[in-house]
Amino acid sequence: MENQSSISEFFLRGISAPPEQQQSLFGIFLCMYLVTLTGNLLIILAIGSDLHLHTPMYFFLANLSFVDMGLTSSTVTKMLVNIQTRHHTISYTGCLTQMYFFLMFGDLDSFFLAAMAYDRYVAICHPLCYSTVMRPQVCALMLALCWVLTNIVALTHTFLMARLSFCVTGEIAHFFCDITPVLKLSCSDTHINEMMVFVLGGTVLIVPFLCIVTSYIHIVPAILRVRTRGGVGKAFSTCSSHLCVVCVFYGTLFSAYLCPPSIASEEKDIAAAAMYTIVTPMLNPFIYSLRNKDMKGALKRLFSHRSIVSS
């Protein structure tokens, strides 16, 4: 039996489309990728250039935008190259590298959304303690903890995958190297891998989600108790944007990874993964800029400043 050292590359099936539609597919995903990069970069620039947004909430939002760019780049760039060159292969090392970055950025998305929910909980439910609880040192510690934990999880999955044997060069039924499709190609015992996918995957998915739900269980009644219209409007503005992103993110994530195999076909899995890795990061900047008054103001000031400089 050959081991993993004899495997040089995998074949990525990609998104099913007739050959004559491949260029159209390339154009669509290239446009979506550029919109994602532009939108999230504008969010980062707006937050960095506006002193009014130098708060914990927008600190995590800027990091979330950076992670969204990384999540999309880790999967879409290789797919675009494969479509354009019509060479749908990825090296063994490239596959493991892509898997690592996809897992790290995907898990960071979940953790940052939970951190933002906790920030809103402290700001709305315990406003007098906010400056103490969410001081810069605490935010930096939370950020570092998120990066460390997600790197550990991603490295664990990657190292466990690297120990497996692959008898033949196989076809990955996906457009990137996700864990489950690659595991199906192994001729080794994948019991440990599957157990770690269940344990670690469930932890990094469910625990942040429960933190978000718990935070909003306390936030919603607190908002309803606010008597001034201005106070309700400001609280609702920041929370509604975050809730929209949470719903889109976890909705696509659950569709991609928690649907029973007997119900979801491979095509539906690929479509759900595309929503999670491509569409969601593209929509996030629009959600925050359309529903958040502070962000809309910061973007207007950013563009007005640049127009003055250019003139």
Curated annotation (Swiss-Prot):
Membrane topology, Extracellular segments: 1-23, 78-98, 157-194, 258-270
PROSITE patterns assigned to the protein according to its UniProt record, in alphabetical order: G_PROTEIN_RECEP_F1_1 (PS00237), G_PROTEIN_RECEP_F1_2 (PS50262)
InterPro entries: GPCR_Rhodpsn, GPCR_Rhodpsn_7TM, Olfact_rcpt
Keyword Transmembrane annotated: yes
A single GO molecular function term of this UniProt record: G protein-coupled receptor activity
Keywords: Cell membrane, Disulfide bond, G-protein coupled receptor, Glycoprotein, Membrane, Olfaction, Receptor, Sensory transduction, Transducer, Transmembrane, Transmembrane helix
Known glycosylation sites: N3
Topology of the protein relative to the lipid bilayer: Multi-pass membrane protein
Any one GO CC term of the record: plasma membrane
Matches recorded under Pfam families: 7tm_4
Bridged cysteine pairs (disulfide): C95-C187
Cytoplasmic side: 48-55, 119-137, 218-234, 291-311
GO biological process, one term: signal transduction
Location of this chain's protein in the cell: Cell membrane
Membrane-spanning segments: 24-47, 56-77, 99-118, 138-156, 195-217, 235-257, 271-290
Function: Odorant receptor.
Protein name (database record): Olfactory receptor 1N1
Organism: Homo sapiens
Lineage: Eukaryota, Metazoa, Chordata, Craniata, Vertebrata
